[in-house]
Curated annotation (Swiss-Prot):
The gene is rnpA. One of its GO terms (molecular function) is tRNA binding. Disulfide bonds: none annotated. It catalyses: Endonucleolytic cleavage of RNA, removing 5'-extranucleotides from tRNA precursor. RNaseP catalyzes the removal of the 5'-leader sequence from pre-tRNA to produce the mature 5'-terminus. It can also cleave other RNA substrates such as 4.5S RNA. The protein component plays an auxiliary but essential role in vivo by binding to the 5'-leader sequence and broadening the substrate specificity of the ribozyme. This is Ribonuclease P protein component. GO terms for cellular component: ribonuclease P complex.
Length: 122
C-alpha cells in the first residue's frame, strides 16, 4: 500500500479520533471521518503493546492488516479517512482470522458494502 494511502501525522490521527465515529468488534475498533476532498481513502493502523509484546508480533499484525486493505481497496469508500485500532483479542490471529474480523469491522463502519456472514471466534 502506498504511503499516500496512510494517515501518518499525529494531527491527522487526533482529528479522526476526536471528530470521527467509531464501531468495534472483538478484534478491531474503527474510527471514521468523511473527507469529500480526498481522491482516495487514507488509513491509519495502531497496534499497541498489549496486543503484541514484541515488535515482531505487532509488525506482523500490521502487515496482515495492510495486506487486507490492499486487497480490498477497490471496495473501500474513497472519501473517508479511517483508523484501525487492534484489540488484544487479535493477538494470535493468522491472516485468515485478521481478514474475516477486519472485513466485518469495516462493513459495520460502512467503509465497505458487504457484511461477511460470520466472524471467526477462537
Amino acid at each position: 500500500m502506498r504511503k499516500s494511502y496512510r494517515v501518518k501525522s499525529e494531527k491527522d490521527f487526533q482529528q479522526v479520533f476526536e471528530s470521527g465515529d467509531s464501531v468495534a468488534n472483538r478484534a478491531f475498533v474503527i474510527y471514521t471521518v468523511e473527507k469529500t476532498e480526498n481522491k482516495h481513502f487514507r488509513v491509519g493502523i495502531s497496534v499497541g503493546k498489549k496486543v503484541g509484546h514484541t515488535a515482531v508480533a505487532r509488525n506482523r499484525l500490521k502487515r496482515y492488516i495492510r495486506a487486507v486493505i490492499d486487497e480490498e481497496k477497490l471496495r473501500i469508500n474513497p472519501h473517508v479517512d479511517f483508523l484501525i485500532i487492534t484489540r488484544p483479542y487479535a493477538r494470535d490471529f493468522n491472516m485468515i482470522k485478521v481478514r474475516k474480523n477486519l472485513l466485518h469491522a469495516l462493513a459495520l463502519a460502512h467503509i465497505i458494502e458487504e457484511v461477511p456472514d460470520e466472524v471467526e471466534e477462537n
